[in-house]
A protein has these predicted regions:
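N-terminal auxiliary segments of SAM/dcSAM-dependent transferases
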Residues: 2-87
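SAM-dependent Rossmann-like transferase core, predominantly class I methyltransferases
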Residues: 52, 62-149
């Protein structure tokens, strides 16, 4: 029986070989492989690296194969396949009806908008306009809890 580590290497190699683009909720073939493995095994995203030594569940093999085929052949984003994406550490449900939460602006928010905003104060009002599903507004609200978003 293959371990999670073995499966991780296999799935990552398949994603790399498929010539896919990354950055739709997951930044690399490795990140996408982890997400697919955990979703196929029906495990939450937060896992210890000790899981890598554990056997990959036999009952998850078919789900993993189907998910990988959809990603590689149909080019669907992993966020749609697994139903979630993370932006600045915030979990968002995700499917084909909305854009995958992703934006380099999220990093600016987590860094307190430095160097564009004075560190001694926080913004009082933040507007998320025409940025997709409102994910940047949600991230802003977590980064600046005293602001009206």
């Amino acid at each position: 029986m293959a371990t999670f580590a073995t499966k991780l290497g296999q799935v990552q190699a398949a994603l790399d070989a498929a010539g896919l683009c990354f950055g739709h909720g997951y930044e690399s073939a490795h990140d996408e492989a982890v997400a697919l493995l955990l979703a196929a095994a029906k495990l939450p995203a937060a896992q210890s690296t000790a899981l890598l030594a554990e056997p990959f569940p036999v009952e998850a093999e078919k789900r993993l194969s189907q998910m990988l085929a959809v990603r590689c052949n149909e080019r669907q984003p992993v966020a749609y396949i697994v139903g979630e994406a993370y932006l600045a550490g915030v979990r968002f449900l995700s499917d084909h009806r909305a854009l995958v939460p992703r934006s380099p602006i999220a990093q600016l928010l987590t860094e307190g908008l430095f160097p564009w905003w004075a560190a001694a104060s926080s913004p009082r009002h933040i507007v998320d306009v025409c940025c997709g599903g409102g994910s940047l507004g949600i991230v802003a609200a977590t980064c600046f809890p005293e602001a009206t978003v």
